[in-house]
Amino acid sequence: MSWEGFKKAINRAGHSVIIKNVDKTIDKEYDMEERRYKVLQRAGEALQKEAKGFLDSLRAVTASQTTIAEVISNLYDDSKYVAGGGYNVGNYYLQCVQDFDSETVKQLDGPLRETVLDPITKFSTYFKEIEEAIKKRDHKKQDFDAAKAKVRRLVDKPAKDASKLPRAEKELSLAKDIFENLNNQLKTELPQLVSLRVPYFDPSFEALIKIQLRFCTDGYTRLAQIQQYLDQQSRDDYANGLLDTKIEELLGQMTSLDICALGIK
């Protein structure tokens, strides 16, 4: 902050003492437009944060899929079973999620940034400039109200120096012009900014839907192919509501093994 700006800040800090309710400027139309803008600002900042989080989540999901697929592949790895004419369904699953990660998710990274993240970020950069304009308007309002208070006091209690009132009135006129120009500009342009949000974000919204559709469709298509390698009997048992019983039988067989009870003997 410059020295001049520092002095202005100190002066404004003392305005609250001299400004009475009768001096305060009230513009309900502006207040309404500022509230609408604040709603847009909060939504825009939240959208920027969540859009970045969405991209990170896609990466996290595929990374987790790959990790668990590697574990499952090792779990199913049985050379005797494979040598006997079987196959390692875990390997097919691992290859499936690896292909999904490299051929789908990584290809979506660029389009997601270009069509969703970048436009949202660019829109959000305007918030800082608008906040500065709103802050400046508030400062000019304080100056205007203080000038009104000064004139009111000189009218109520005339000074010995007769030139003080004309000077104060001139300062009031200047403060009024500065405030009203900025106030009217914000009242005109804030609604325009708010109304532009839908046509601006529409293409990004459409792109986000298409990216989600591609992610879900490709994932479903690839994973659906793994079903042909799953045990048909287990699939039939699940469809017929018998799978829980089968699992209980397998757990019973495991419990009957001596090695499962060695730790408690």
Curated annotation (Swiss-Prot):
PROSITE patterns the record matches: BAR
The protein, known as: Reduced viability upon starvation protein 161
Chief location category: cytoplasm
Coiled coil: 126-193
Residue span(s) of domain BAR: 15-239
Keyword set, alphabetical order: Coiled coil, Cytoplasm, Cytoskeleton
GO MF term set: cytoskeletal protein binding
One cellular component term from this protein's GO annotations in UniProt: membrane raft
Lineage: Eukaryota, Fungi, Dikarya, Ascomycota, Saccharomycotina
Cell compartments where the protein resides: Cytoplasm, Cytoskeleton
Job description of the protein: Component of a cytoskeletal structure that is required for the formation of endocytic vesicles at the plasma membrane level.
Record-level GO BP terms: actin cortical patch localization; actin cytoskeleton organization; actin filament organization; conjugation with cellular fusion; endocytosis; lipid tube assembly; plasma membrane tubulation; regulation of endocytosis
UniProt miscellaneous comment: Mutations in this gene results in sensitivity to carbon, nitrogen and sulfur starvation. Present with 7390 molecules/cell in log phase SD medium.
InterPro entries, alphabetized: AH/BAR_dom_sf (IPR027267), BAR_dom (IPR004148), BIN3/RVS161-like (IPR046982), Rvs161/Hob3_BAR (IPR037429)
Gene3D superfamilies, sorted: Arfaptin homology (AH) domain/BAR domain
Any matching Pfam family: BAR
Species annotation: Saccharomyces cerevisiae (strain ATCC 204508 / S288c)
